[in-house]
Amino acid sequence: SGSAKVAFSAIRSTNH
């Protein structure tokens, strides 16, 4: 359930 949230957080961090 939290896997998607972690992935999104990582993508967001990389996008920054």
UniProtKB/Swiss-Prot annotation:
Tissue and organ distribution: Localized in the Purkinje cells. Cerebellin and [des-Ser1]-cerebellin are equally abundant.
Every C1q domain range: 1-16
Keyword DNA damage listed: no
Highest rank taxon of the organism: Eukaryota
One Gene Ontology biological process: maintenance of synapse structure
Key words of the record: Cell membrane, Disulfide bond, Glycoprotein, Membrane, Postsynaptic cell membrane, Secreted, Sialic acid, Synapse
Cross-referenced InterPro entries: C1q_dom (IPR001073)
Functional summary from the UniProt entry: Required for synapse integrity and synaptic plasticity. During cerebellar synapse formation, essential for the matching and maintenance of pre- and post-synaptic elements at parallel fiber-Purkinje cell synapses, the establishment of the proper pattern of climbing fiber-Purkinje cell innervation, and induction of long-term depression at parallel fiber-Purkinje cell synapses. Plays a role as a synaptic organizer that acts bidirectionally on both pre- and post-synaptic components.
Subunit and partners: Homohexamer; disulfide-linked homotrimers. The trimers are assembled via the globular C1q domains. The trimers associate via N-terminal cysteine residues to form disulfide-linked hexamers. May form oligomers with CBLN2, CBLN3 and CBLN4 prior to secretion. Once secreted, does not interact with other CBLN family members. Interacts with GRID1. Interacts with NRXN1 and NRXN2 long (alpha) and short (beta) isoforms produced by alternative promoter usage. Competes with NLGN1 for NRXN1-binding. Weakly interacts with NRXN3 short isoform and not at all with NRXN3 long isoform.
Protein name according to UniProt: Cerebellin-1
Taxonomic classification: Eukaryota, Metazoa, Chordata, Craniata, Vertebrata
Gene name linked to the record: Cbln1
